[in-house]
């Protein structure tokens, strides 16, 4: 059943919250409202929290952009809170409507009338509420849950929840998605309500395990605790712990079954009902959107009074989560009422404060969810299925399942349970049962509210989904968005005050709060008790009727809550409240805190909770001031009560504690320390330092919420419990992520979470709408002043975040996106991560944690929570990583990222989070310090410290954690005060110190840093799981590696460190300008060098002089770059140079270490010692030493990339840092130089092997530079090495004939105008096939060198080249061989050599030998490009155009061949290819460029260079000389699944498929002549290339995380290379194999020995989709296409980010580099051409109807393959579509062109070969069709499939000038085909 929402005013029923919200905002509804109340009434816009007088004014408002933006934002928020039920009608309105509907209600059946009439429903709800309350009272919470839930369950089920378990779940999913429908559901009738609740519970329903159990319901809310109890026998524990509270903890399930309406019915029986859970979730969400105040106040009133009314909307769910719930609502498990109460309360509070109908505003708030609703629906649907299936399984096993899913589920359970436990523990042991109930209820309420709120964000559906997920990651996703917000606000309040109050309590509360941030925050969850008291008091005036009833239960609940106020209190303040009412909340919280402090630490926790509650309430009400006062008073009141009930609650806590601790322990294996003796430890913790424990709880609570959001309550709780002390939930979240849910669970979780976290992140593509919606995601109305303020929507949203339950992730995402649009965050991923976990929804693609640097002021807790929502956000991250990227991860963890608006409050809050284990004061202190520190501290440091602390918290006593926190704080402050570079160093040192000081802290820190980083970027689960979860797409491979990349990416994306010192930025700017000048002068030097060489006169001497000059400039540049990088690092506060990538080549060990570090969180361990030695030792010994100068440059660039993370980073190319990298940077800052040095040295060694080529002079210079810069940046070494390699390349070319020559030649060719010479070389080389002897001669001479030297050095060679060039030109007539531009020269240099080699390789492979250094490597690498046709065998005498390679040459030589050059380049490419082994396959990068369904689709794997002019003739030459026979057209059979990549090498067609095999076909016979097996998963890419001599090897990359190297002759697997993630694309050049992984990294291998060289963190957590190479002067470029919609241009030697090419709106699937241009095909159905060197978007080719999977350039034409089953041929210059080739039965996954034959591989496993003939054109003259086919049969197929319907009844032939008419009766169906085919044959041919 889909939960329905009914507008009791308009009598319209909606199936989703979104629809209901849209209706509630609509003029239709407001007209009815005016009809009901009279003209000129106040129309409140819930979304904007603005009241307009009169319908016209309201109409004007809703048509405004601000409102639309707010709606978008709220929808986003509600995406996560979909479960939450909103009150769409306040009490007054409900009464009015009820009166008006009294008659109709009486007329209608009871259920309908109830749904329709508030009165009916009210009584029923009241009765039900009372029953639940009575039950609760009689059961004293645990019993209540125990018995009550079953009672309710059965009752509800009877009422219509019976089917809920099956149908209701889905229903509830949908309904939860539509809190608006809440009222409808409630109204529907008790029965309807029950259905509603079931719907709410649907999460529970999905989790039927909760069905009969309260626990499940809790789970439903998405709190782990409920799951734990549910799944297991823990149910009683939960009951004891929080019969109510627990349920509350499991906000998701709790609300529904526990609370009001449904809750009442459900209350006890329902408690277990999955549906209840869903309702709970819905309520929670509603609460979240309603905000605590509403919850609190209205819960009391609404629970009873409005339960009938509000129950209609949200009453049932709200009942439980409403603020009043804590005291009475807690006892009453009327989620619905609670929700409605919350809504009402919020409205009431608003009314009180604003003097208007708060509910109305609330309703509108709920209405925001409209957009989220849709997503919610989707999520719900998904969840329904998932939950439905899981639910039944989980219902009973839920608890067990939770435990089993430890990482995923357990954490959820844990969170739910631990919160309960904590709450009970926090509370004194006065009345265990009662307290457990009260506390638990309160907490559950909070949790539920939080969960609902968060889920509300994703949508209530999302919430339900989270419930579904809940078993795995119950709350993570739904909570993630709202959760974060709640957590942030709550974190602020809670962490500042609540954290100290009670660890366990806090945890529970926090969980609850997080779950029901919006409603709970108002004092729903956190302030359960306080809120109940507060809310009851506050609401008492408004909701006296419910209050009276609630007051009894509420009294108990309050007492209980009071007992667990610490718990509630802590969570509450920190949750939404703080965010909602930043200043006010803070003050209120402060006052409350003071009161609490006065009371006692334990009590103070309670007080804080109360205060938080009050604050939350106030926030919700929107009358911040009034509410604040009210809150304060309530807070005090609550505190008193809390004190009273705290003691009784302790036993409950204790009782819960064991169970909790068990869960926690399991989950906290990582973070067991804090919760060490989960039972006694936690209790002791609470008792010994209630403040500390409370802090812990708060932190944990935040963490758990985050975890819920992120992973699950269980994870959250675990993190919270153990590590909350250390770090804000954000940090814990990552830890949780690492807890190790099963990879599959994690993946699912991430997907769900990301979906939930991001309202619109279902798709893999970036969801801009999602980002936009984020702004208003808070779901709470903003103050009118805020609405009306002229602030930008995003800013306003951020500022109002505390007030509203903002999904900070989304907010950040939006901000980041905007900044990026402005060019601010330019880069790493110029696009928002698609779905925020887009396709993958892996939220690792969840990794939507934007760079929080922009939100530096935000409260860490809040941020943490988002981080906690990591799972949801994991996906988001990927998808919305852009958003989160903006805020540094550390900020994210520290809270600086989230609470811009709450910066002041946030400061304390983060501290609290950090020192959760510490005393309240300490926590507050830390928060205060951390908040400031966070902004300044680098992501790395903060993340590192906090994660470490978090982890330690789990592993070490709170004492340890505290020190860590302090150290982190100190570090932050230090960093703040120190200059960037200094700070960087300090950060490194501080981090290292804190880490080391914590014993295993080092590892923990690095791990945590990684995790934290990752968690923000990736999903918490992934992070925590690092290893197991790494598999999530977002952060795959190395858990930390992906994570770090995520982080890195975040940083890069955000790239805005608003708080970074401007001076640093200015400095950076100055240095950058200077560096630019120098780089220009360097280019000039290169040009001069080339000219000098070309001149050959005094060239040699001159070249030497110029080389020296160049070296000097390079060294100076390196120094500058180093300085700049340091500054950038300081800005980023993360000093993790991409040196890792740089180092990677030199030290596989380093990379591996790094990976292991990321995975095992041993980054720290890796750090200083190992790297230092390595750095120190290798540099001097290797040529790399000389290269340090250059490495410095590189380092600078690398750092620059890092540094670009800050505001200025946008301009500076920032290398996206993977979480791992970032973590490394954090860990490495101190020993960074040394570490990197080591790695660099290793790299240098590697380079030495292949870099011995470099001249000694450069080495010397480099060594000097290295010595100077070694410590400056380890990256420098690498960079220097790179630079040296370049320089060496030049000088060696002079010095050493072979390698140096090659390098020099290559360099010269690349570097300078040697383009002419290069062109000649190319021509000659490309023509070499023509003259094998000549080719051989030149080839032996080192084609690269030959090119460079012969072109530049020997006139003779040059002349010969020119001759060849001329000859070739003649031969190629159409193959234009224009001179290569400087940019191209390198490319062409390599290519000509390659070409020569191709010819030679094919013939003698002499070129291979001669091709030393880069050239040979290039040739080898070049073979990757299938498209590069080898001119070698211009077998076709008709055209020497043999060299007409496909655009492979583009890949090979992106330099500047003109279009003609492109042809030549293509030719050259083939030569290189052939040299590589006669490999005509398009570059591997192309092969791996495109991915479909995660399967790489080769882009233009074999691009035949058919000059268009010579295109008719098969001008391409296959790599091997034996390709004399012409390939035949037809099909190749054998594959059983999608063909992912295709390459032609030696007259054979190599294909790889998802059927795990690679097949080899003969091009002539088309028979399969061999099969390569061994992979265990789909093979995504392949690359055939030459190795030493004539031997050739096949590399295959697979989703089984391996690359296998086969001997192509014996077909034996020679080696298997293990990688961290799925291998999506391969590319080779310069004797290096580049592998693009799904975690966003590029790993390089030496083709000679298959040794790993480097790891470049490029686009993590988003996958690398395709690779290509190019050259820029002497610099070798690696072009990386990614799923984040951007293409990054990097230094191929060290991975340094040079620039980012943006423009695509979806995943980049394929690339082809030609001359200076990169042609990229994307899922956005377009092909873009960018200038590689400037980053400028030159042109866009449209006309595709689906994703473009392959792009090939053949001369002047571009051939593209598309998923719409067509191959299109475009003219490059005019953009005209020349031809279309069809005939495919499925989507084209890969394509290559060889000898004018197009080879395509399809998704169904079919492979076809079709002749490319531009001379034959068959036009489709069907009306409106403009396609021109190259094959008549394709036209026929097109006509029959696209223009006719096989089932037509009547058909009119719409061919030009034809009016034939066919009918099915005439039996003319057969005639149709014949008729149409005749048209095709007779009338279609057009003269060309």
UniProtKB/Swiss-Prot annotation:
CDD domains: WD40. InterPro entries: PQQ_b-propeller_rpt, WD40/YVTN_repeat-like_dom_sf, WD40_repeat_dom_sf, WD40_rpt, Znf106, Znf_C2H2_type. This is Zinc finger protein 106. One of its GO terms (biological process) is insulin receptor signaling pathway. Changing residue 659 to C: In strain: C57BL/10. GO terms for cellular component: cytosol; membrane; nuclear speck; nucleolus. Residues 68-187, 287-326, 338-362, 410-437, 453-525, 537-617, 635-661, 696-728, 894-920, 968-1064, 1281-1461, 1468-1487, 1509-1531 are annotated as: Disordered. Residues 90-108, 118-138, 150-160, 296-311, 577-593, 968-986, 1450-1461 have a biased composition (Basic and acidic residues). The modification Phosphoserine is found at residues 657, 677, 876, 878, 881, 909, 953, 1040-1041, 1046, 1291, 1293, 1296, 1313, 1339, 1381, 1474. Changing residue 262 to P: In strain: C57BL/6 and Swiss Webster. The gene is Znf106. RNA-binding protein. Specifically binds to 5'-GGGGCC-3' sequence repeats in RNA. Essential for maintenance of peripheral motor neuron and skeletal muscle function. Required for normal expression and/or alternative splicing of a number of genes in spinal cord and skeletal muscle, including the neurite outgrowth inhibitor RTN4. Also contributes to normal mitochondrial respiratory function in motor neurons, via an unknown mechanism. WD repeats lie at residues 1534-1573, 1575-1618, 1659-1700, 1703-1742, 1743-1780, 1783-1820.
């Amino acid at each position: 059943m889909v939960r329905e929402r009914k507008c009791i005013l308009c009598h319209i029923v909606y199936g989703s919250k979104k629809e209901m919200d849209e209706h509630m905002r609509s003029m239709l509804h407001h007209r009815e409202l005016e009809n009901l109340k009279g003209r000129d009434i106040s129309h409140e816009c819930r979304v904007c929290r603005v009241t307009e007088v009169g319908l016209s004014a309201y109409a004007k408002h809703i048509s405004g952009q601000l409102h639309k933006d707010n709606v978008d934002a709220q929808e986003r928020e509600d995406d996560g809170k979909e479960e939450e039920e909103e009150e769409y009608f306040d009490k007054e309105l409900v009464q009015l409507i009820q009166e008006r509907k009294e008659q109709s209600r009486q007329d209608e059946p009871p259920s309908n009338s109830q749904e329709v009439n508030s009165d009916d429903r009210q009584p029923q709800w009241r009765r039900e509420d009372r029953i639940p309350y009575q039950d609760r009272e009689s059961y004293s919470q645990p019993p209540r849950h125990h018995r009550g839930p079953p009672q309710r369950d059965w009752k509800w089920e009877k009422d219509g929840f019976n089917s809920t378990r099956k149908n209701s779940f889905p229903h509830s999913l949908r309904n939860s998605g539509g809190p608006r429908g809440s009222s409808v559901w409630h109204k529907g009738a008790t029965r309807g309500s029950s259905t509603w609740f079931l719907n709410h519970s649907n999460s529970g329903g999905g989790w039927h395990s909760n069905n009969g159990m309260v626990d499940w319901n809790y789970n439903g809310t998405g709190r782990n605790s409920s799951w734990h109890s549910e799944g297991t026998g823990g149910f009683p524990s939960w009951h004891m712990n929080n019969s109510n509270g627990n349920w509350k903890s499991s906000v998701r399930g709790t609300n529904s079954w526990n609370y009001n309406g449904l809750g009442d019915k459900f209350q006890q029986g329902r408690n277990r009902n999955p549906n209840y859970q869903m309702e709970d979730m819905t309520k929670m969400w509603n609460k979240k959107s309603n905000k605590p105040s509403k919850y609190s106040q209205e819960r009391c009133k609404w629970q009873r009074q409005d339960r009938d009314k509000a129950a209609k909307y949200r009453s049932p769910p709200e009942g439980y989560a409403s603020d009043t719930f804590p005291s009475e609502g807690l006892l009453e498990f009327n989620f619905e009422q609670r929700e409605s109460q919350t809504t009402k309360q919020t409205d009431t509070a608003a009314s009180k404060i604003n003097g208007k109908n708060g509910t109305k505003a609330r309703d509108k708030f709920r209405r925001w969810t409209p957009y989220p609703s849709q997503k919610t629906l989707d999520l719900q649907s998904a969840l329904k299925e998932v939950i439905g299936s899981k639910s039944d399984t989980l219902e009973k096993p839920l608890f067990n399942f939770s435990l089993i899913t430890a990482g995923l589920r357990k954490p959820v359970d844990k969170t739910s349970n631990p919160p309960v436990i904590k709450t009970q523990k926090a509370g004194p042991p006065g009345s265990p049962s009662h307290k457990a109930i009260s506390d638990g209820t309160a907490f559950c309420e909070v949790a539920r509210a939080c969960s609902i709120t968060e889920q509300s964000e994703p949508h209530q559906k999302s919430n339900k989904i989270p419930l579904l997920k809940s078993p795995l990651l119950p709350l993570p996703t739904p909570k993630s968005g709202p959760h974060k917000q709640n957590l942030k606000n709550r974190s602020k309040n809670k962490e500042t005050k609540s954290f100290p109050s009670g660890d366990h309590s806090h945890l529970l509360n926090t969980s609850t709060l997080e779950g029901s941030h919006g409603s709970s925050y108002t004092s729903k969850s956190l302030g359960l008790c306080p809120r109940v008291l507060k809310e009851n008091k506050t609401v008492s005036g408004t909701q006296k009727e419910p209050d009276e009833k609630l007051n009894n239960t509420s009294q108990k609940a309050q007492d209980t809550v009071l007992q667990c106020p610490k718990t509630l209190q802590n969570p509450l303040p920190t949750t939404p409240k703080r965010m909602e009412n930043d200043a006010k909340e803070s003050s209120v919280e402060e006052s409350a805190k003071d009161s609490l402090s006065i009371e006692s630490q334990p009590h103070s926790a309670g007080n804080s909770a109360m205060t938080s509650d009050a604050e939350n309430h106030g926030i919700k009400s929107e009358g911040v001031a009034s509410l604040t006062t009210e809150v304060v008073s309530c807070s005090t009141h609550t505190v008193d009560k809390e004190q009273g009930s705290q003691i009784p609650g302790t036993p409950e806590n204790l009782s819960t504690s064991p169970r909790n601790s068990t869960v926690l322990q399991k989950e906290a294996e990582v973070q067991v320390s804090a919760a060490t003796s989960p039972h006694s430890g936690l209790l002791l913790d609470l008792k010994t330092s209630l403040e500390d424990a409370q802090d812990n709880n708060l932190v944990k609570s935040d963490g758990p919420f985050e975890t819920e959001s992120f992973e699950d309550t269980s994870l959250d709780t675990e993190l919270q419990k153990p590590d909350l002390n250390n770090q804000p939930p954000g940090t814990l979240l990552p830890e949780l992520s690492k807890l190790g849910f099963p990879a599959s669970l994690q993946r699912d979780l991430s997907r769900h979470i990301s979906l939930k976290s991001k309202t619109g992140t279902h798709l893999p593509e970036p969801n801009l709408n999602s980002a936009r919606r984020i702004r208003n995601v808070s779901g709470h109305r903003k103050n009118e002043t805020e609405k009306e303020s002229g602030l930008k929507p995003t800013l306003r949203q951020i500022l109002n975040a505390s007030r509203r339950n903002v999904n900070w992730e989304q907010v950040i995402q939006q901000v980041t996106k905007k900044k990026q649009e402005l060019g601010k965050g330019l880069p790493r991923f110029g696009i928002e991560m698609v779905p925020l976990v887009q396709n993958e929804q892996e939220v690792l693609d969840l990794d939507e944690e934007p760079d929080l640097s922009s939100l530096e002021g935000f409260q860490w807790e809040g941020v943490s929570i988002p981080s906690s929502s990591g799972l949801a956000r994991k996906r988001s991250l990927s998808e919305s990583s852009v958003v989160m990227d903006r805020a540094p991860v550390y900020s994210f963890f520290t809270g600086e990222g989230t609470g811009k608006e709450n910066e002041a409050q946030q400061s304390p809050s983060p501290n609290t989070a950090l020192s959760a284990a510490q005393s309240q004061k300490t926590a507050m202190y830390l928060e205060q310090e951390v908040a400031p520190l966070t902004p300044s501290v680098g992501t790395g440091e903060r993340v590192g410290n906090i994660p470490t602390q978090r982890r330690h918290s789990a592993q070490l006593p709170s004492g340890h954690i505290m020190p860590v926190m302090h150290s982190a704080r100190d570090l932050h402050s230090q960093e703040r005060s120190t200059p960037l570079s200094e700070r960087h160093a300090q950060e490194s040192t501080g981090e290292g110190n804190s880490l080391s000081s914590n014993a295993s802290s080092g590892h923990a820190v690095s791990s945590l840093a990684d995790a934290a980083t990752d968690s923000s970027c990736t999903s918490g689960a992934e992070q925590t799981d690092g290893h197991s979860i790494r598999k999530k797409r977002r952060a795959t491979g190395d858990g930390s590696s992906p994570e770090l990349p995520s982080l890195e990416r975040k940083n890069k994306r955000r790239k805005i460190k608003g708080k970074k010192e401007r001076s640093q930025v200015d400095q950076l700017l100055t240095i950058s300008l200077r560096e630019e000048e120098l780089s220009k002068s360097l280019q000039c030097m290169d040009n001069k060098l080339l000219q000098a060489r070309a001149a050959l006169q005094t060239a040699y001497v001159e070249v030497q002089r110029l080389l020296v000059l160049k070296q000097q400039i390079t060294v100076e540049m390196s120094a500058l770059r180093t300085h700049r990088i340091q500054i950038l690092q300081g800005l980023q506060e993360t000093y993790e140079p991409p040196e890792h990538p740089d180092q990677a080549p030199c030290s596989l060990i380093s990379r591996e270490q790094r990976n292991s570090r990321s995975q095992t969180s041993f980054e720290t361990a890796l750090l200083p010692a190992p790297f230092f030695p390595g750095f120190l030792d290798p540099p001097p010994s290797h040529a790399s030493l000389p290269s340090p100068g250059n490495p410095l440059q590189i380092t600078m660039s690398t750092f620059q990339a890092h540094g670009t993370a800050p505001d200025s980073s946008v301009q500076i190319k920032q290398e996206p840092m993977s979480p791992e990298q970032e973590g490394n940077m954090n860990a490495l800052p101190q020993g960074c130089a040394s570490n990197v040095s080591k790695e660099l040295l290793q790299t240098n060694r590697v380079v030495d092997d292949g870099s011995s080529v470099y001249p000694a002079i450069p080495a010397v210079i480099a060594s000097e530079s290295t010595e100077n810069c070694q410590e400056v940046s380890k990256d420098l070494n690498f960079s220097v090495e790179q630079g040296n390699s370049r320089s060496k390349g030049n000088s060696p070319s002079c010095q050493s004939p072979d390698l140096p020559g090659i390098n020099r030649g290559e360099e010269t060719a690349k570097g300078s105008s040697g383009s002419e010479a290069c062109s000649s070389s190319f021509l000659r080389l490309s023509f070499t096939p023509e003259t094998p002897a000549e080719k051989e001669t030149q080839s032996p001479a080192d084609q690269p060198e030959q090119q460079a030297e012969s072109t530049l050095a020997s006139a003779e060679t040059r002349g010969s080249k020119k001759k060849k060039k001329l000859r070739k030109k003649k031969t190629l007539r159409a193959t234009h061989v224009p001179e290569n531009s400087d940019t191209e020269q390198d490319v062409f240099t390599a290519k000509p050599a390659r070409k020569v080699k191709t010819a030679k390789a094919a013939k003698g492979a002499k070129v291979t030998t001669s091709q030393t250094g880069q050239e040979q490597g290039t040739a080898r690498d070049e073979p990757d490009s299938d498209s590069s046709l080898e001119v070698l065998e211009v077998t076709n005498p008709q055209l020497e155009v043999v060299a007409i390679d496909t655009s492979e040459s583009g890949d090979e030589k992106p330099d500047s061949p003109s279009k003609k050059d492109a042809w030549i380049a293509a030719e050259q490419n083939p030569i290189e290819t052939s040299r590589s082994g006669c490999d005509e396959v398009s570059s591997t990068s192309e092969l791996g460029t495109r991915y479909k369904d995660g399967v790489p689709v080769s882009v233009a794997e074999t691009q035949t260079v058919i000059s268009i002019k010579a295109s008719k003739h098969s001008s391409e030459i296959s790599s091997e000389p034996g390709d004399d026979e012409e390939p035949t057209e037809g099909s190749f059979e054998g594959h059983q699944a999608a063909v992912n990549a295709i390459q032609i090498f030696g007259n054979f067609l190599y294909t790889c498929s998802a059927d795990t095999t690679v097949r080899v076909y003969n091009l002539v016979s088309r028979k399969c002549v061999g099969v390569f097996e061994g992979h265990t998963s789909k093979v995504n890419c392949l690359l055939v290339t030459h190795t030493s001599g004539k031997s050739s090897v096949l590399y295959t990359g697979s989703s089984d995380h391996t690359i296998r190297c086969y001997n192509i002759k014996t077909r034996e697997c020679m080696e298997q290379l293990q990688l961290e993630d799925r291998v999506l694309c391969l590319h080779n050049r310069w004797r290096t194999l580049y592998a693009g992984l799904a975690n966003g990294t590029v790993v390089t291998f030496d083709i000679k020995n298959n040794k790993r060289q480097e790891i470049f963190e490029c686009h993590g957590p988003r996958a690398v989709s395709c690779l290509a190479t190019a050259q820029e002067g002497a610099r070798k470029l690696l072009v990386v296409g990614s799923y984040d919609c951007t293409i990054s241009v990097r230094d191929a030697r060290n991975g340094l980010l040079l620039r980012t090419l943006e423009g695509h709106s979806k995943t980049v699937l394929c690339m082809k580099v030609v001359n200076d241009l990169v042609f990229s095909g994307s899922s956005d159905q377009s092909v873009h051409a960018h200038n590689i060197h400037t980053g400028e978007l030159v042109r866009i080719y449209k006309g595709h109807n689906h994703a473009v999977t392959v792009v090939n350039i053949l001369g002047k034409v571009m051939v593209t393959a598309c998923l719409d089953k067509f191959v299109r041929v475009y003219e490059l210059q005019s953009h005209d579509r020349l031809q279309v080739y069809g005939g495919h039965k499925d989507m084209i996954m890969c394509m290559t062109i060889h000898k004018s034959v197009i080879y395509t591989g399809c998704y169904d496993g079919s492979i076809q070969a079709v002749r490319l003939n531009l001379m034959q054109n068959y036009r489709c003259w069907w009306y409106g069709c403009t396609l021109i086919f190259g094959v008549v049969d394709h036209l026929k197929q097109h006509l029959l499939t696209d223009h006719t319907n096989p089932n037509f009844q009547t058909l009119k032939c719409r061919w030009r000038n034809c009016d034939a008419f066919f009918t099915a009766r005439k039996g003319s169906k057969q005639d149709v085909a014949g008729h149409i085919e005749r048209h095709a044959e007779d009338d279609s041919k057009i003269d060309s």
